[in-house]
Amino acid sequence: VQRVGPSTGMPTRTQQCDIKSCAYASHGDTMHVLLCPADPADCFYMAVQAFDLAERLQTPIMVLSDLDIGMNDWMVPELEWDENYIPDRGKVLNAEELEEMENFYRYLDVDGDGIPYRSLPGVHPKGAYFTRGSGHTT
Protein backbone atom coordinates (compact mmCIF):
# COMPACT_ATOMS: atom_id res chain seq x y z
CA VAL A 1 0.00 0.00 0.00
CA GLN A 2 1.55 3.26 -1.11
CA ARG A 3 1.55 6.30 1.12
CA VAL A 4 3.68 9.35 1.74
CA GLY A 5 5.54 7.57 4.55
CA PRO A 6 5.79 7.68 8.33
CA SER A 7 8.83 9.98 8.42
CA THR A 8 7.16 12.88 6.58
CA GLY A 9 4.47 13.66 9.12
CA MET A 10 1.77 12.63 6.62
CA PRO A 11 1.60 8.84 7.05
CA THR A 12 -2.13 8.59 6.35
CA ARG A 13 -2.35 10.66 3.18
CA THR A 14 -3.32 8.78 0.02
CA GLN A 15 -0.68 8.91 -2.70
CA GLN A 16 0.71 6.90 -5.62
CA CYS A 17 4.30 7.98 -5.06
CA ASP A 18 5.92 4.56 -5.60
CA ILE A 19 4.78 4.00 -9.19
CA LYS A 20 7.67 5.84 -10.84
CA SER A 21 10.22 4.32 -8.44
CA CYS A 22 8.99 0.81 -9.25
CA ALA A 23 8.79 1.46 -13.00
CA TYR A 24 12.45 2.52 -13.20
CA ALA A 25 13.98 0.41 -10.41
CA SER A 26 16.85 -1.20 -12.32
CA HIS A 27 19.93 -0.56 -14.41
CA GLY A 28 17.69 0.52 -17.27
CA ASP A 29 18.06 -2.71 -19.22
CA THR A 30 14.65 -4.14 -18.31
CA MET A 31 11.04 -3.12 -18.29
CA HIS A 32 8.85 -3.79 -15.26
CA VAL A 33 5.25 -4.91 -15.10
CA LEU A 34 3.19 -2.81 -12.70
CA LEU A 35 -0.43 -3.63 -11.90
CA CYS A 36 -2.42 -0.92 -10.14
CA PRO A 37 -5.79 -2.09 -8.82
CA ALA A 38 -8.55 0.46 -8.33
CA ASP A 39 -10.59 -1.41 -5.71
CA PRO A 40 -10.47 -4.59 -3.57
CA ALA A 41 -12.05 -6.69 -6.34
CA ASP A 42 -9.25 -5.59 -8.67
CA CYS A 43 -6.75 -6.64 -5.98
CA PHE A 44 -8.23 -10.15 -5.98
CA TYR A 45 -8.24 -10.60 -9.75
CA MET A 46 -4.92 -8.83 -10.33
CA ALA A 47 -3.22 -11.11 -7.80
CA VAL A 48 -4.07 -14.08 -10.02
CA GLN A 49 -3.00 -12.13 -13.11
CA ALA A 50 0.28 -11.18 -11.40
CA PHE A 51 1.18 -14.82 -10.72
CA ASP A 52 0.41 -15.79 -14.32
CA LEU A 53 2.44 -12.90 -15.73
CA ALA A 54 5.36 -13.63 -13.40
CA GLU A 55 5.47 -17.26 -14.52
CA ARG A 56 4.99 -16.48 -18.22
CA LEU A 57 7.47 -13.58 -18.39
CA GLN A 58 9.86 -14.95 -15.72
CA THR A 59 10.12 -11.60 -13.98
CA PRO A 60 8.82 -10.00 -10.79
CA ILE A 61 5.41 -8.37 -11.08
CA MET A 62 4.56 -5.46 -8.80
CA VAL A 63 0.99 -4.92 -7.61
CA LEU A 64 0.67 -1.39 -6.25
CA SER A 65 -2.37 -0.20 -4.37
CA ASP A 66 -2.80 3.05 -2.51
CA LEU A 67 -3.81 3.84 1.04
CA ASP A 68 -7.43 4.40 0.02
CA ILE A 69 -7.83 0.70 -0.80
CA GLY A 70 -5.99 -0.38 2.31
CA MET A 71 -7.82 1.71 4.90
CA ASN A 72 -11.36 2.42 3.70
CA ASP A 73 -14.47 0.27 3.76
CA TRP A 74 -15.53 -0.98 0.34
CA MET A 75 -18.60 -2.60 -1.18
CA VAL A 76 -17.63 -4.90 -4.03
CA PRO A 77 -19.60 -7.48 -5.99
CA GLU A 78 -19.18 -11.06 -4.81
CA LEU A 79 -15.79 -12.31 -5.97
CA GLU A 80 -15.98 -15.22 -8.39
CA TRP A 81 -13.40 -17.94 -8.84
CA ASP A 82 -13.37 -20.02 -12.01
CA GLU A 83 -13.04 -23.65 -10.88
CA ASN A 84 -11.74 -24.52 -14.37
CA TYR A 85 -8.93 -21.97 -14.17
CA ILE A 86 -5.56 -23.36 -15.23
CA PRO A 87 -2.50 -21.35 -14.14
CA ASP A 88 -0.29 -20.10 -16.97
CA ARG A 89 3.14 -21.50 -16.13
CA GLY A 90 4.75 -20.09 -19.25
CA LYS A 91 7.39 -21.86 -21.27
CA VAL A 92 8.13 -24.98 -19.22
CA LEU A 93 9.83 -28.04 -20.67
CA ASN A 94 8.49 -31.43 -19.60
CA ALA A 95 10.53 -34.64 -19.14
CA GLU A 96 9.94 -35.83 -22.72
CA GLU A 97 11.07 -32.52 -24.22
CA LEU A 98 14.17 -32.47 -22.02
CA GLU A 99 15.00 -36.06 -22.99
CA GLU A 100 14.91 -35.15 -26.69
CA MET A 101 17.34 -32.24 -26.21
CA GLU A 102 21.07 -32.71 -26.52
CA ASN A 103 21.73 -29.88 -24.02
CA PHE A 104 19.49 -27.61 -21.99
CA TYR A 105 20.66 -24.01 -21.68
CA ARG A 106 18.55 -22.19 -19.13
CA TYR A 107 18.93 -18.72 -20.63
CA LEU A 108 18.96 -19.58 -24.35
CA ASP A 109 16.26 -17.69 -26.25
CA VAL A 110 15.41 -20.30 -28.90
CA ASP A 111 12.40 -18.58 -30.47
CA GLY A 112 13.44 -14.90 -30.32
CA ASP A 113 10.76 -13.57 -27.97
CA GLY A 114 13.22 -12.81 -25.16
CA ILE A 115 11.78 -15.43 -22.82
CA PRO A 116 13.78 -18.66 -22.46
CA TYR A 117 12.29 -22.06 -21.73
CA ARG A 118 12.67 -23.31 -18.18
CA SER A 119 12.43 -26.59 -16.34
CA LEU A 120 10.78 -27.37 -13.05
CA PRO A 121 12.92 -28.91 -10.28
CA GLY A 122 12.99 -32.69 -10.26
CA VAL A 123 11.36 -33.22 -13.67
CA HIS A 124 14.47 -34.58 -15.40
CA PRO A 125 18.23 -34.59 -14.70
CA LYS A 126 18.87 -32.66 -17.94
CA GLY A 127 16.70 -29.84 -16.60
CA ALA A 128 19.01 -29.10 -13.68
CA TYR A 129 21.11 -25.96 -13.89
CA PHE A 130 23.37 -23.85 -11.70
CA THR A 131 22.73 -20.14 -11.58
CA ARG A 132 24.29 -17.18 -9.86
CA GLY A 133 23.91 -13.45 -10.03
CA SER A 134 27.04 -12.63 -12.01
CA GLY A 135 26.20 -14.06 -15.43
CA HIS A 136 24.41 -16.56 -17.64
CA THR A 137 25.27 -19.29 -20.07
CA THR A 138 24.09 -18.88 -23.65
Short names for language-model regions:
Residues 1, 22, 35, 61-63:
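Generic structural hydrophobic/aromatic packing signal, biased to beta-strands
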Residues 1-29, 81-82:
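Flexible glycine/proline-rich, aromatic-decorated loop/lid segments
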Residues 5-12, 33-40, 94, 106, ...:
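Hydrophobic alpha-helical scaffolding
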